[in-house]
A protein has these predicted regions:
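Secretory targeting and sorting signals
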Residues: 1-21
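Short linear S-[DN]-x-LW-Φ motif typified by the pepsin-like aspartic protease active-site region
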Residues: 20-73
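Extracellular beta-strand repeat scaffolds in secreted/surface proteins
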Residues: 37-43, 61-67, 113-119, 133-138, ...
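A low-complexity, Ser/Thr/Gly/Pro-enriched, surface-exposed linker/loop concept
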Residues: 60-93
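Right-handed parallel beta-helix
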Residues: 80-136
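Glycine-centered beta-turn/loop sites at beta-strand termini
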Residues: 108, 117-118, 127, 135-136, ...
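Consensus positions within tandem repeat domains that build extended binding/scaffold surfaces
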Residues: 112, 131, 148, 163, ...
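Residues at the loop-to-beta-strand transition
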Residues: 112, 121-123, 129, 139-140, ...
């Protein structure tokens, strides 16, 4: 069990939480910090965002990242509107000769927001309060926060409070359901799942998974692979599936 705790701690430590800066009043703000090789997007209070973060062209010592939304944006340092008068599309630049890896952090704030990411530099996405659709396939860490959220990402998924649906992608991932009755789909890879409090439904998918049900009446399905399934307190249904499994109530 100590090895599992170490594994969980290692996964969380890769992309630490970042405090959200304050957005420009009335508009979401996106700006770059070349000293930190980072770009930060912060939604304005009361906005409902439909954000796309996309890679663009590269040249003259910089690469460009596009931020397209359904609401007006305010460009900060090293960022500008794609076209004059079009306030919903901002392009930011990062130098290509930095020793640091690119880091893009997105804070969506309140509202029922949506995001889709395809840029590989996305580090964290925080949905904030509201029922969010977070299709952040390239993001390392995705947090739904409060609300009934759809959460998708590359390494660490955290549903937060609410009835959330977490969907992993290929690879080894860490998935936390949080409080609420959650649906968690781990898919391929050696995944670690902690469903949290609530009546949760977990599907391990292919791979050797470790699944903790937590409190509540959970349904845990290891599916293919050599899985470890721990039900926790509550009236749980635990099924290992094909493979050499360890199941505990």
């Amino acid at each position: 069990m100590s090895a599992v705790v170490t594994l969980l701690a290692t996964g969380l430590a890769v992309s630490p939480a970042v405090a959200a800066p304050t957005a420009a009043e009335g508009k979401a703000r996106v700006g770059a910090d070349w000293a930190k090789q980072s770009v930060t997007f912060t939604a304005a209070p009361g906005q409902v965002n439909d954000l796309h973060v996309v890679p663009m062209d590269q040249g003259d010592g910089v690469r460009r990242i596009g931020f397209r939304d359904s609401v007006p944006l305010q460009p900060g340092d090293h960022c500008t509107y794609l076209e004059p008068g079009v306030e919903t599309y901002v392009v930011c630049e990062l130098p290509t000769d930095s020793a640091r890896p690119d880091r893009i952090d997105v804070f969506l704030g309140d509202g029922d927001d949506e995001i889709a990411t395809s840029d590989p530099g996305v580090a964290t996405v925080s949905g904030g309060p509201g029922d969010d659709m977070l299709h952040a396939h390239t993001a390392h860490t995705v947090r739904g926060d409060a609300g009934d959220d759809m959460v998708m990402g590359r390494v660490v998924l955290d549903g937060g409070d609410g009835m959330d649906h977490l969907m992993a992608v290929d690879g080894d991932q860490f998935l936390w359901g949080g409080r609420g009755d959650d649906m968690i789909e781990a898919y391929d890879g050696k995944d670690v799942v902690s469903a949290g409090p609530g009546d949760d439904h977990v599907m391990g998918g292919d791979g050797d998974d470790i699944v903790f049900g937590g409190s509540g009446d959970d349904m845990l399905h290891g599916e293919a692979g050599d899985d470890v399934l721990v039900g926790g307190s509550g009236k749980d249904t635990v099924e290992g599936g094909p493979g050499r499994n360890i199941t505990l109530p």
